[in-house]
Amino acid sequence: MKHPFKKILERKYRPQLVMAIAIPFFQQVTGINVIAFYAPILFRTIGLGESASLLSSVMTGVVGTISTFISMLIVDKFGRRALFLAGGIQMLVSQIMVGGVMVAQLGDHGGVSKGYAYLVLVLICIYVAGFGWSWGPLGWLVPSEIFPLEIRSAGQSINVVVNFLFTFIVAQTFLAMLCHFKAGIFFFFGGWGVVMTVFVYLFLPETKNVPIEKMEIVWQEHWFWRRVVGDFSKDTKMEAP
């Protein structure tokens, strides 16, 4: 296919371009890679010992792996939107609860009681599980389902670049934000959880069992995107032999 990056800028591919940017962006501002990169530091901050912090990091990794496997089993039954929405709400609630516990219990010198420290660990595992069966795998699956062949290479390239770019940005800024916001960092990521869940609810159509060649119809029938892409079915018919 010739000039995929030029084609993806065309009006009829505007929804795919938006999703190629928005989905990986939201995937990273969930804060999941912060947990992956800095979990031992985070767990030591709330009062767990060094060994317990490392073990807790392994535990969150196992939870993420299991929940991703669960996603593989249920995604075709419940659909992409349902998992996006449920996972987003699960992450939002757990982040708010973690932030609330830390605001209430974390003193100026750091550390909380053992009971609350393990409560935070459980809540973070719930958060990781929410990501693992929703935004984790679906952040890669859905973009692969919405790009037609003529823009697939461009769309997937944009998706990967945006993902890695915001992985880098979030990872580089997290420690500074943690020092500045303290427990408020969880409310910060929770706020993005609200935004991305509303975005999916309003703007992402269901892609389950939709062939790639039929995706243009999905956009044309969507309440918002039909105003953006217009009706190019006539043009398609004129081009047909």
Regions found by a protein language model. Name each.
Residues 1-241:
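Alpha-helical transmembrane bundle of multi-pass membrane proteins
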